[in-house]
Amino acid sequence: MDRRKKGSKHHLATDAAGTPLAAEVTAANVNDVTRLIPLVDAIPPVRGKPGAPRHKPGEVMGDRAYHDEQRRTVLRGRGIAPVLARRGDPHGSGFGILRHVVEQTIALLHQLRRLRNRFDKRDDIHQTFLTIGCAVICWRRLHRLTG
């Protein structure tokens, strides 16, 4: 952990279409791997097919920053398949093709000035604006589908 690193990071969980399901703000010097399980826990139940809503994703994809054998074991114990790039493996694994969905959603969030440049000193205020930004993205997608 680099204790001198300033700023904050946005951790984001999306569905396959890039719709934000959960978002979290942490300090820039926090390791990404420590936020994997809380981010998965923050995903709300999602309705889809008839019946009870899904309370957990079928699989979790992530880049090398989220790879850890202990976290993989926890996810498998919950019935979630971890599809995480391993540290030390050569590049070209094909994750970039899938990762662009999350990167595009992050880019949409950073189009909002309050999220691109952090002016808020308090984390809870910045987290609120991140949640509002996710709601704006969801509304725009819904409006585009129904409009």
Language-model features, listed with the residues they occupy:
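Polybasic low-complexity intrinsically disordered regions
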Residues: M1-R87, G133, R140
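Basic, amphipathic alpha-helical segments enriched in Lys/Arg and hydrophobic/aromatic residues
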Residues: E69-T73, G77-G79, G92-G147
